[in-house]
Amino acid sequence: MILAIDTSSKSASCALLDGDDVIAESFCNAGVTHSATLMPMVEGLFTATGRKTDEIDMFAATSGPGSFTGVRIGASILLGLAFGKGLPCVGVSALEATALPFESFRDVIICPVMDARRGQFYNALFRNGERLTDDRAISGEDLYAGLSTGNSPVLLCGDGHALAAPFMKDLVLVDAPRDLIYPRASNVGRLARRIREASPSGTFTDLEFKPVYLRPSQAERVMSEKKQ
């Protein structure tokens, strides 16, 4: 059984999966801090299903990019739950997890966007289930410039979709179902399973799980400016 969590954006979610099948999932987009909501949500999954924590054989979480605080909270909770158990801990790209529900869309550019502040988005591009770019921090203008060189329609998803839409100008946009716009822990679990199966010799220990930050945090920027 997989326990998967996502805290990379404004929403938070957790899920229990048996393979790719969802046993139970909890999702919250109420604007409450993840540190206050996630553990009660996880506990609620076990209460509702009657499953036990010793049934877990893999942990999965979004390792970034996204909210610095959110990613750190998710990593801390994952590592706390996994401590001493010797079970695989698999980190998943939040952008890839957001794009996953749309991998069956043919010849459409799947464009997950997360608000990175400071005039940028966290973004990656996918088409026909294949990754086209690495995860990156990019301006709306540069994102449009790259997309406008092709003729494929574009599907925006992620918590930055409404902010990114005005930059898309004359591009053909495909509407995404609103309940699929945000990353879901169930898709984090599915991706983690694929990653582990693709690397059967990988250990994926809790010590190897590392958050991915594409930019320095605000605190790190302030510290760097003071040193200059």
List where the protein language model places each region:
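DPxDG-like acidic metal-binding loop motif
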Residues: 60-94
